[in-house]
Amino acid sequence: MITDPISDMLTRIRNAIKVKADKVDIPASRMKIEISKILKEEGFIKSYKIIKDKKQGIIRINLKYTSEGDSVISNLQRISKPGRRVYVSKDEIPHVMGGLGVAILTTSQGVMTDKECRHKGVGGEVICYIW
């Protein structure tokens, strides 16, 4: 049984990148779909597709690589975990890798990047960092 589905998603992506896989399948949930949407908007993945099955559905993420064959994603780091939640106010939103990376937060207005949170003036729970 998976106790932290978001960590499982990030680990599956990390493992797929290590073996230079073109795509990775992840069990779907609303939160994971929102995270996939942000990864696509920020240019970390080529695309994602939701595949219906008899259970919860599957998200198929097509990974993105440079012309040299290196992954666009250098690293993914889970911040807020079930055993230790991490919340930040609008003034404490972190800059990942000096602005080169992205922090994904879940707020009262939905899942968004650190840049969107600063623009809208909202804080929330820091889900992960991606760079």
Swiss-Prot record:
GO terms for cellular component: cytosolic small ribosomal subunit. It comes from the Bacteria. One of its GO terms (biological process) is translation. InterPro entries: Ribosomal_uS8, Ribosomal_uS8_sf. One of its GO terms (molecular function) is structural constituent of ribosome. Keywords: Ribonucleoprotein, Ribosomal protein, RNA-binding, rRNA-binding. It holds the Pfam family Ribosomal_S8. SUPFAM superfamilies: Ribosomal protein S8. Part of the 30S ribosomal subunit. Contacts proteins S5 and S12. PANTHER family: 40S RIBOSOMAL PROTEIN S15A. One of the primary rRNA binding proteins, it binds directly to 16S rRNA central domain where it helps coordinate assembly of the platform of the 30S subunit. Belongs to the universal ribosomal protein uS8 family. This is Small ribosomal subunit protein uS8. It comes from Thermodesulfovibrio yellowstonii (strain ATCC 51303 / DSM 11347 / YP87).
